[in-house]
Amino acid sequence: KADVYTVFLGTNDWWGGRPLGTFADYENNGGYQTFYGSFRIIIDKLRRLNPDAKIILMTPMQRVDFVYIANMKNNAYGSYKEKKGQMLGQFAEAINAIGKHEKLKVIDLYNTKRLSVKKLVKYKRLKDPQTGVYKNYAYPDFIDVPFNPETDEYPYPVESIAMTYDGLHPSDEGYEVITEKLVKILKKL
C-alpha cells in the first residue's frame, strides 16, 4: 500500500499489437481486450489498494529502431511508423485523455522535446548498402538502411548513446529528464 503510484507503460502494448480501443472502453470498464480497458483495470486496482494514494501517469517515450545488445535478433523499428495500424502516439494520447478525465497528473514523455526521436541516439552504425562500409546514420537517415542481426555489428556503440542507449530504453541522461519531471510533480503533492 503506497502513498504514490506511477504508471509508466504503453510502448510494449503498442509493439505487441494490443488494440487501443476507445475511451468508452475505459469509461465502461471494458476489460483487458483493449489498452483503454486494461488501463481502467490498473487504475481501479490502485484505487482499491489505497483510495487516498496519488497516481501519476507517464506516457511512453518516442522510440527509434531498437536492437537488444544481448540478442540482436530481438530488434524492432521505431515509433515513426504504424504497428498493426496504430501509432505509438495514439497510446500517449490515450494516457493523456485518461489523466484529464480522472484529474491525475500526467508526465507526457512522448511530447517532451528533450526526448524527441532526433535526440534518442546520436546515430545508428550500419553498413552502407552501396559500399558495405560501416557508416554512422543520424535519424531519420537510418530508417531504410538494412540491418542484418546475423552478420552486422551492434549498431549502437557507446559513442552513439544519447537519451537512450539502444533506441528504446532510457540512458542515464534520458532517466535524468524523466526524473526531473517526476520530482517536479512529487514536490507539489
Predicted regions and their residues:
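Alpha-helical cap/lid subdomain in secreted, periplasmic
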Residues: 1-189
